[in-house]
């Protein structure tokens, strides 16, 4: 068995195995642990009472967190005409059509979000093998294919998170940076869970939000006592 590093030992000494933590307690504890050499994110994992093998129980959506994620988001938009001007005015980093597609095919993929207006999908459709593996392919289910590209850009810049259940019925997303006030972080998590409940599949039975776990990028996951959340 591999030996624990000094950092791992220091973390293990502060964590109570099997404990469900009050949200503020968990956030404060995670922030106090030995840090990595970069500003870590707070990440949330929510175990849902769904069967992801059934297509009608795949949970996929996007929501704008009230306090953002603390990340600077680079956005590319496929559109043209007045919509292109609106996208730039909303803060898009790059707007184009065939020219933008050519750049991406050549390897220029330094974007966090790619948005497209419906009329631009004829161009975007050629980029499936480029954008798909990186999770950048525009999709109407998460608001990245929209006739209102300006609003889509504003949402992305404001801290919109996109999520989808994995094969175990768990969604994972970042909800802020270490350094966020615990109250604001909590409101972000509550907004996410409220959105998950809003889109609960009709065929999902029993307990829907089964478990909520908060962690930092390089830190341990702490199970949250859901009674400490206003959801």
Swiss-Prot record:
Domain of life: Bacteria
Alphabetical UniProt keywords: Repressor, Ribonucleoprotein, Ribosomal protein, RNA-binding, rRNA-binding, Translation regulation, tRNA-binding
An annotated GO cellular component: cytosolic large ribosomal subunit
Keyword Zinc in record: no
Membership in a protein family: Belongs to the universal ribosomal protein uL1 family.
Subunit relationships: Part of the 50S ribosomal subunit.
Protein name, per record: Large ribosomal subunit protein uL1
């Amino acid at each position: 068995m591999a030996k624990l590093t000094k950092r791992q030992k220091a973390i293990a000494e502060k964590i109570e195995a099997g404990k469900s933590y009050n949200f503020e307690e968990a956030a404060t504890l995670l922030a106090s642990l030995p840090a990595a050499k970069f500003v870590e994110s707070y990440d949330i994992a929510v175990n849902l009472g769904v069967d992801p093998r059934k297509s009608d129980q795949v949970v996929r959506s996007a929501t704008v967190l009230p306090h953002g994620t603390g990340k600077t988001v680079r956005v590319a938009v496929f559109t043209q005409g007045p919509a292109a001007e609106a996208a730039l005015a909303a803060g898009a980093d790059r707007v184009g059509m065939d020219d933008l597609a050519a750049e991406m095919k050549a390897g220029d993929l330094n974007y966090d979000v790619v948005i497209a207006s419906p009329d631009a999908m004829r161009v975007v459709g050629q980029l499936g093998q480029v954008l798909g593996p990186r999770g950048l392919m525009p999709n109407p289910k998460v608001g990245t294919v929209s006739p209102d590209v300006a609003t889509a850009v504003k949402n992305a810049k404001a801290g919109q998170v996109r999520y989808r259940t994995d094969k175990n019925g768990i969604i994972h997303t970042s909800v802020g940076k270490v350094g966020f006030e615990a109250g604001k972080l909590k409101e972000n998590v509550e907004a996410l869970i409220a959105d998950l409940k809003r889109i609960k599949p009709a065929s999902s039975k029993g307990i829907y939000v089964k478990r909520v776990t908060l962690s930092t990028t390089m830190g341990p996951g702490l199970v949250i006592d859901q009674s400490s959340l206003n959801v």
